[in-house]
Amino acid sequence: MSHEEKNIVVLVEDTDAFGRLNWRVFCRYCELGEAGLLKDLGFDQMYFYERYGISFPRRLARFEYLSQVFPTDTVDFKTEVKRVGNTSLTLSHIFHKRSKKAEKPLLTAKAEVVIVAYDEKNHRKMPLPKELVERIREIRPKAFDV
C-alpha cells in the first residue's frame, strides 16, 4: 500500500538562499504523503482525532539527501507503510525529481518517519487504533513481518 504524488511544482519561495529546495519542504511532502495514505486507507486525516482523541506526532524523522532540487524541477514522491508496531507506524518516503536536463526521474531523497498514536486526553502514547491496523493488514500484510 502506497500513496503517490507526481509533478509537484517546486516554488521559488520553497528554496534556500542558494536556490535549492529547502529541507523543511521535504517534511511538508512527508506530511502530504501521510495524509494521502490515510485517505487511501479510507480515513480523513482528522478522523482518529475527532472520533477518539488520537493524534499521530512524529517520534523520529531521518532524511538522506542524494541530489539537489531546483525551481526548474518537479518532484514525485511515494509514501508507504514500512512497519506496523504496537503504538507506531514507520513510513517510508521516496522522492524523485524530474528535470529538463535528465531523461528519467532521478532519486533525490529518502526519508523514514515514525509516527506514534498519542492519546490527547491522557498525554501519552497508546496502541494504534484497531480499525487502522486491520485496514493496513488487509492491504499491506508484510508491514507486520518486520
Language-model region placement:
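HotDog/MaoC-like acyl-thioester-processing domains
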Residues: 1-6, 69-74, 82-146
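Hot-dog-fold acyl-thioester-processing enzymes
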Residues: 1-59, 118-146
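Hydrophobic beta-strand-centered segment that forms part of the acyl-chain substrate-binding groove
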Residues: 38-90, 106-110
